[in-house]
Amino acid sequence: MSYTWLITRASSGRGAAIALAALEAGHKVIAGARNPAKASQVRPEIQNQGGTWLRLDDSTADVRHVIAKAAKEHGLNVLVNNAGGYALRGVLEDFSETELYQQMETNFFGPIRAIQGALPWSRAQKPGTIFNISSTSDITGFTGFSLYAASKAALEGASEALYGELALFGIRVLVVQPGASRTKFQSAGPRPAVSEACVGTTVDAILQRAVGMAAERR
């Protein structure tokens, strides 16, 4: 049976891979990207295989209406919240108020908005599935990634509660916790600045190694 998938942040990395896998399995795919024109140039195979690009910015409240409109036009069975390609690295005490909100915006508020936009249509077109892409950092809490781990923990907590809310409607909520993979994740966030008090400590070594790994993958 063919379902309609909507995948957020599908222009590169894991999101693009999921979109292509769904297309190859015979499903319909709506690939979300902040700049569809650029995305279609970077990943033309998604459109060539029948995928539809959608301008989708989950950092704005309007994303709810954008998803609702797309669902009305194409249908919607599966939502993939491909959040997490951005991680602020550094010592917790050094993060600014803006950075605190920025990390939560990317990995928590954005996916929640997408879910809110999709739910009315998912309920109407059973069965439905919501995939929230999380991380093993929620389990291990890697040194130097405190904000990232917190944002993923928030998404997983909401997912567990939502599982109970939606079970009666035939909608599954699944959390995916991928480990290390060959994407540009390590280079997506800004280079960490380590406070003087932490220079030479374990957290300093881990952060600098993360930067080195990112450089090796480019």
Swiss-Prot record:
Induction remark: Expression is positively regulated by the transcriptional regulator wor1. Expression is down-regulated during biotrophic growth within tomato leaves. The expression is induced at later stages of infection when conidiophores emerge from the plant and produce conidia.
| Annotated NADP(+) binding sites | 38, 57, 82, 148, 152, 183
Q: Can you tell me where the transmembrane regions are?
A: none
This protein's record includes keyword Oxidoreductase: yes
Annotated active site residues, numbered on this chain, are 134 (proton donor), 148 (proton acceptor), 152 (lowers pka of active site tyr)
Q: What SUPFAM superfamilies has UniProt attached to this entry?
A: NAD(P)-binding Rossmann-fold domains (SSF51735)
Q: Name the source's superkingdom.
A: Eukaryota
Q: What is its EC number?
A: 1.-.-.-
Q: Could you tell me which pathway this protein works in?
A: Pigment biosynthesis
UniProt KW keywords: NADP, Oxidoreductase
Q: GO molecular function: any one?
A: oxidoreductase activity
Identify its protein family: Belongs to the short-chain dehydrogenases/reductases (SDR) family.
What is the annotated role of this protein in its UniProt record? Oxidoreductase; part of the gene cluster that mediates the biosynthesis of the bianthraquinone cladofulvin, a conidial pigment not required for virulence but that plays a role in fitness and resistance to environmental stresses including UV light and low-temperature stress. The pathway begins with the synthesis of atrochrysone thioester by the polyketide synthase (PKS) claG. The atrochrysone carboxyl ACP thioesterase claF then breaks the thioester bond and releases the atrochrysone carboxylic acid from claG.
Name of the protein this chain belongs to: Oxidoreductase claN
Q: Give the source species.
A: Passalora fulva
